[in-house]
Amino acid sequence: LLQGIALSSRAQEQQMWQRYHDKCRREASIIDTLPSKLEKALHWSPTINKEQKEVIRYILWNMVYVEGGTANLGDNNNYPVDVASFFINRYEVSQDEWYVIMGENPSNQHRRNYPVDQVNWFNAQRFTQKLSQLSGLPFRLPFEAEWEYAARGGLKTKNFIYAGSNNAEQVAWFREKYYNTYVSKETGTKKPNELGLYD
């Protein structure tokens, strides 16, 4: 199973995490300039460490407000659903974020800003529960209707075939086009949809 995988040295791994933390620190510092409402809403756990705090601030900075509305969802757009307003992250959860919050990286190939893989719904639930425990904020997974509504662009939808474009290559990585493999790609590298959501 490990054939063809190069494991990084400890020094390389430390440099990788340092670059990631520096990036988080730079981007998370922006959130500190927002009104103190957000900071007041946070109730940091006494067990939280500095890196976890930075990651949670980074996640919050990348939350996108999705205004609620009525949409026709489902494969044939024939299932009308009322969706309340909510927030959703503009990116998939990265391996870095998962590692800092959960203390492990279950992914097959460890790559810093790639989406976490080898996790199921229960693992994802544990991740959101841990975010809530550490921050005091009510993190959760989106409901299926919320996810589809956001992927389609919410009230800003232009009714593209795919989430953000009629050309799948602009917005998605797909197996047939990329050497017939199941390799994940770095988050946020394709065009976002109408709400600014990637991947």
Where do the protein language model's features map onto the residues?
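Boundary at the C-terminal end of the N-terminal hydrophobic targeting segment
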Residues: 9-11
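Long amphipathic alpha-helical scaffold segments
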Residues: 40-48
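Functional-site microenvironments in short loops/helix caps that host divalent-cation chemistry
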Residues: 66, 72, 107-110, 115, ...
